């Protein structure tokens, strides 16, 4: 193997919008800002819900609902 070809790892902080701060090793070398993390993501917190924006499900069922019925 060749010597000195791998990037240097540095410990950085990844900060989430919920305020959670995570220390990780990375080659980026600068702090990261996350939108969601394991502490606030709906899948991991169990608060998962379906959001119907603008009645899209009703609009779909109105257009194609009759096709599924026999």
UniProtKB/Swiss-Prot annotation:
The keyword Metal-binding applies. The keyword Cytoplasm does not apply. Zn(2+) binds at residues 16, 18, 37, 40. Keywords: Metal-binding, Ribonucleoprotein, Ribosomal protein, RNA-binding, rRNA-binding, Zinc. Binds 1 zinc ion per subunit. NCBIfam families: L31, PRK00019.1, PRK00528.1. HAMAP family: Ribosomal_bL31_1. This is Large ribosomal subunit protein bL31. It comes from Shewanella sediminis (strain HAW-EB3).
């Amino acid at each position: 193997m060749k010597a000195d070809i791998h990037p240097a790892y540095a410990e950085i902080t990844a900060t989430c919008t919920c305020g959670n701060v995570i220390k990780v090793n990375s080659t980026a070398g600068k702090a990261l800002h996350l939108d969601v993390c394991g502490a606030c993501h709906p899948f991991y917190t169990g608060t998962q819900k379906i959001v119907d924006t603008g009645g899209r499900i009703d609009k779909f069922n109105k257009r194609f609902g009759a096709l599924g019925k026999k």
